Amino acid sequence: MADLTSPGISVSRREDGIGAEVSGVNLSLPLSSEAFAAINEGFERYRLLVFCKQDLSVKQQVEFSERFGRLEEFPDPKDQAEGYETVLRVSNIERESGNIKPVDDPGHKSFTLGTSSWHIDSSFRTLPSRASMLYGKEIPAAGGDTMFADTTRAYDAL
């Protein structure tokens, strides 16, 4: 059952207890103010939103992300997705050849070591980001999990 609704959009709490799933929206198309307001209200309430079955270009992801506020920049072009300095490309696929990097590849290994530990994106900044947006292009059937925690709920439980 939907907890929040807007014409055609439904925001429903996920059964696993964290976040909500948003349905009835195509993020590759421009969003009305009302539709974005429903999504933003869902974000404020649940802190984690899942949008299934989306097909976005990097440009479309940036346009949607900008609705939430100013985006962080990643100045090193090798880290950027298609030249967008506000999108960090995270991949085990080599950009030039399209080959999958071996697990022992120094660049891949240093990245996975740095991200495999629990962390909160941008927590080191004076003003941390409001959110992180992930868009998976090729998701493995098993493994490669990204985990989330509701730190507000954890703090309130202390």
Model-derived regions: residue spans:
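Non-heme Fe(II) oxygenase catalytic core, chiefly the N-lobe of the double-stranded beta-helix
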Residues: A2-L158
